[in-house]
Amino acid sequence: MGERLGIFGGTFNPVHRGHLAMARAARDRCGLDQILWVPAAQPPHKPLAGGASIGDRVEMVRLAIAGEAGMALSLVDARRPGPSYAIDTLRLLEEQYPQAQWHWLLGQDGLADLPGWYRAAELIPRCRWIVVPRPGSGADPKQAMADLTERFGAVFVPLSDFECDISSTRVREQLAAGRAGWEALLPEQVVSYIHKRGLYDVPAGA
């Protein structure tokens, strides 16, 4: 039996404390041996908001997970050209870890979009889906999961009692509006990096 590995894909623009809480919860509650953080160079399903290059986003993730047990950075998406399709990500990781059991972290709000992902019928049955609640995500997740299970043979592992209202969008909005308090939403080393690099219109070196 191979390792139980998690895939945590995203733009991480920027990575925040909510991302870390989500990864820790998935690792601990689902008994994962390791979670691979996979920053997307070019997300296929939504435009990438401005503020940080893929190099900066990779470095922020590296800083955020430094010293975290059972977490590692993967560059399979960052290093390849074109859209970061999930099926391509999974196939590359399967080549690197041929004996692994795969678990994909998915925000609850992504359930409705999952059937529209590139080559969804091939992708969905190939891993288990750890579904993380998101505030205000609307539709009943139980019904959505039941429909996807019937249609694609999906296997879901809900983190039903997880709560976190931090999002990268919220962080960027606070930064754009010049509101104080955004630093508390991010790991300290990521805050320092943003100041050092002058990302998200923060004055460099401030």
UniProtKB/Swiss-Prot annotation:
Cross-referenced InterPro entries: Cyt_trans-like, NadD/NMNAT, Rossmann-like_a/b/a_fold
A Pfam family recorded for this sequence: CTP_transf_like
Keyword list, A-Z: ATP-binding, NAD, Nucleotide-binding, Nucleotidyltransferase, Pyridine nucleotide biosynthesis, Transferase
Transmembrane stretches, start-end: none
A biological process term (GO) from this entry: NAD biosynthetic process
Family named by the database record: Belongs to the NadD family.
PANTHER family: NICOTINATE-NUCLEOTIDE ADENYLYLTRANSFERASE-RELATED, PHOSPHOPANTETHEINE ADENYLYLTRANSFERASE
Protein name: Probable nicotinate-nucleotide adenylyltransferase
Organism for this UniProt entry: Gloeobacter violaceus (strain ATCC 29082 / PCC 7421)
